[in-house]
Curated annotation (Swiss-Prot):
GO terms for cellular component: cytosolic large ribosomal subunit. PROSITE patterns: RIBOSOMAL_L17. Belongs to the bacterial ribosomal protein bL17 family. This is Large ribosomal subunit protein bL17. Keywords: Ribonucleoprotein, Ribosomal protein.
Length: 145
């Protein structure tokens, strides 16, 4: 019987589950939208909402709790400075799950989890801005070689 077992196990050990949660939380905070399987998205949603609620409280204790859960100072700073300000008028429901069909290889149900009222430009954090003139000079170098 499954009495009193509220948490999803996701067929992983407890340490693997904690690492998965931390990595997915950091990715969601950094990019504000990630694509994953539906069970993982359902596992992540309440935890992400709790992190935002924790970031809205302005105490040293909550900052330390954020650092212990995320273990990434840039993610913790983004929660405290950006996301908490964006959702200060909202009481919960900071994320949404959108079903995104099925994965090709194993037919697993996929989903997109994202922040409500997200910043569309946040997905472009790591992409380098390419200069078209520089690309043409590189093509010329390759053509002459």
């Amino acid at each position: 019987m499954r009495h009193g077992m509220a948490n999803k196990k996701l067929n992983r050990t407890s340490e693997h589950r904690k690492a998965l949660l931390k990595n997915m939380l950091n990715s969601l905070i950094k990019y504000e939208q990630i694509t994953t399987t539906l069970p993982k998205a359902k596992f992540l949603k309440p935890q992400a909402d709790k992190i935002i609620t924790l970031g809205k409280k302005e105490t040293l204790q909550t900052t330390k709790m954020l650092m212990s859960k995320l273990q990434d100072i840039t993610s913790a700073n983004k929660v405290k400075k950006t996301l908490s300000k964006r959702y200060e008028a909202r009481n919960g429901g900071y994320t949404r799950i959108i079903k995104a069909g099925f994965r090709y290889g194993d037919n697993a149900p996929m989903a997109v989890i994202e922040f409500v009222d997200r910043d569309v430009e946040a997905k472009r954090v790591d992409r380098k801005k390419k200069d078209p003139a520089k690309d043409k000079t590189e093509e010329k170098k390759l053509a002459t070689a």
